[in-house]
């Protein structure tokens, strides 16, 4: 008797050890048939119900798995809470209304966003093309083409399967067989990478919980715990503060560089500006004295030979001063006005100095006047 009880206990222990707990979330747009799908699961697969079980959670026993299925709302508010379940789910079931062609683009956008989420990437996904009993329902091949599933699977490395189904009650059970076939495929895909998916779960950080309100009240699933929210909020504030400090530091460096560049430009401009001449210049006996606000043209009273001209500004024209000895020619007749036969020779002029006005003072000027 003791051996029989021991054998029964060991067999029960082995069976319990073989069973794996799997968490699956059912998502999709509103009116896609998620509620009917859960009811079909309960009709076709034995369910393990508990007294504390909430209306949105269903526990099923299939093969060697104890499956906890969570039905999430598909309205706009419900979609905001989907991401709270991605980390804990081993796999996903996405329900598509194959008869609603007008919303297929919306389905494509939402499914792409879900599959590219880092918490979902790599996890198996079962897509159920629901409402195949209607006339205008899309075939699975059309859904694959519209949703670009081949590209999504290759880029996200997530296994995916499209299964046509219909969840209405009036059809025979054998026509609802694709639902069970799809669920078995999903569990097999989870079992192949169960250890990896188990490590990706964040059970200590977050626990899945559902609202006590009945279906239709809008708030079906609320799973964020307060400590995690506070921790996440503090992390966001810290990241923002780090970003602001880094940005201020970069702006300060740019301002200092701009100030240095402007100071250097002013210094270069100042060095390139024309500098005024010295107040008094003296060279070879000539004295140049500047005067303000006047443009002066210089003229020499000394008559120069033709072709004899110095292009250098300020170069003196040297002439011998007159002595007491005079070189007279023939004395003209006093009755004849000699000035009529003399050609007037203009005075030589030197170039104008535009920088400053200057007067030329020749120390030999008195000698020239004495000769006159």
UniProtKB/Swiss-Prot annotation:
Binding site for GTP: 28-35, 71-75, 130-133
SUPFAM superfamilies in the record: P-loop containing nucleoside triphosphate hydrolases
One term of GO molecular function: GTPase activity
Keywords for this protein: GTP-binding, Nucleotide-binding
InterPro entries linked: Ciliary_GTPase, P-loop_NTPase, Small_GTP-bd, Small_GTPase_ARF/SAR
UniProt family annotation: Belongs to the small GTPase superfamily.
Protein name: ADP-ribosylation factor-like protein 13A
Organism: Mus musculus (Mouse)
Upper classification of the organism: Eukaryota, Metazoa, Chordata, Craniata, Vertebrata
